[in-house]
Amino acid sequence: MSEQNNTEMSFQIQRIYTKDISFEAPNAPQVFQKEWEPEVKLDLDTASSQLADDVYEVVLRVTVTATVGEDSAFLCEVQQAGIFSVGGIDGTQMAHCLGAYCPNILFPYARECITSLVARGTFPQLNLAPVNFDALFMNYLQQSEGAAQQQDA
């Protein structure tokens, strides 16, 4: 038997934690005087690093910016991180695990932090919709392949 046949896929969450958190309301209290019809922008980013054999840190950065007219109402950024044990996979499967599966686990924690911070800033409730990290990962792969093909041309 080859060594590959003896290797089973394993996945375990070791820890989930808030790595960095920031909330700014640069135009308070004036922004509270305005009619609340915000334009809300959501930015997502992920990063991963190997800590040890089969142990990875994945960081999901979620930034929410709300503007009312020309004024910034609030800027909220959360870096939600997790330490994961992942074994028995490599290549595209590992990239998918670290780039989509783990961020999908982290997002509800980041969403709760953002919702809490916005409420503590006394702004109306902010409900962030679930994110399809699998679709975002597939889009990233397609863009990467397109960029590689353009460089080869």
Curated annotation (Swiss-Prot):
It holds the Pfam family SecB. It comes from the Bacteria. Signal peptide: none annotated. InterPro entries: SecB, SecB-like_sf. One of its GO terms (cellular component) is cytoplasm. Keywords: Chaperone, Cytoplasm, Protein transport, Translocation, Transport. It is found in: Cytoplasm. GO terms for biological process: protein folding; protein tetramerization; protein transport. GO terms for molecular function: unfolded protein binding. The keyword Transport applies. Belongs to the SecB family. NCBIfam families: PRK05751.1-1, PRK05751.1-4, secB. One of the proteins required for the normal export of preproteins out of the cell cytoplasm. It is a molecular chaperone that binds to a subset of precursor proteins, maintaining them in a translocation-competent state. It also specifically binds to its receptor SecA. Homotetramer, a dimer of dimers. One homotetramer interacts with 1 SecA dimer. This is Protein-export protein SecB. It comes from Erwinia tasmaniensis (strain DSM 17950 / CFBP 7177 / CIP 109463 / NCPPB 4357 / Et1/99). The gene is secB.
